[in-house]
């Protein structure tokens, strides 16, 4: 039986790693051992930040909503409470987009939510 040498497979693996390390700085782009470590670390960052992206965007929407709602004399927390009481089920992403691109429609939503709040004595 013929002897199997692993030159072809190892070359393919190296090529795959170097392709993934394209654009890296210094020896990270052309030295196999260092490139492999850099690519693995990059994949770890990518995995972690795919999770963090959801948190980051939610925080952004909340900041935008807080700023937009304060123009109408409410705070973010009171606005969200008012939305729940009035039965309006629109997510924060849609509300922030509405506040940016359709201020009149957002003002109507705020007015509807305000009407659900109990009057302060």
Curated annotation (Swiss-Prot):
GO terms, molecular function: rRNA binding; structural constituent of ribosome
Protein name from the UniProt record: Large ribosomal subunit protein bL20
GO CC terms of this entry: ribonucleoprotein complex; ribosome
BP terms from Gene Ontology: ribosomal large subunit assembly; translation
Lineage of source species: Bacteria, Pseudomonadati, Pseudomonadota, Alphaproteobacteria, Hyphomicrobiales
Pfam family, one: Ribosomal_L20
Domain of life, per lineage: Bacteria
Task performed by this protein: Binds directly to 23S ribosomal RNA and is necessary for the in vitro assembly process of the 50S ribosomal subunit. It is not involved in the protein synthesizing functions of that subunit.
Family: Belongs to the bacterial ribosomal protein bL20 family.
Keyword vocabulary terms for this entry: Ribonucleoprotein, Ribosomal protein, RNA-binding, rRNA-binding
């Amino acid at each position: 039986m013929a002897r199997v040498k692993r030159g072809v497979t190892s070359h393919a693996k190296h090529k795959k790693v170097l392709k993934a390390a394209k654009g890296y700085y210094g020896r990270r782009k052309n030295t196999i051992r260092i490139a492999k470590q850099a690519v693995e670390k990059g994949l770890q960052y990518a995995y972690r930040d795919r999770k963090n992206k959801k948190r980051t965007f939610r925080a952004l929407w909340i900041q935008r909503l807080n700023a937009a709602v304060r123009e109408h004399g409410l705070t973010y927390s009171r606005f969200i409470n008012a939305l729940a009481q009035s039965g309006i089920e629109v997510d924060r992403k849609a509300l922030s987009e509405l506040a940016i691109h359709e201020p009149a429609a957002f003002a109507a939503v705020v007015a509807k939510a305000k009407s659900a709040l109990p009057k302060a004595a």
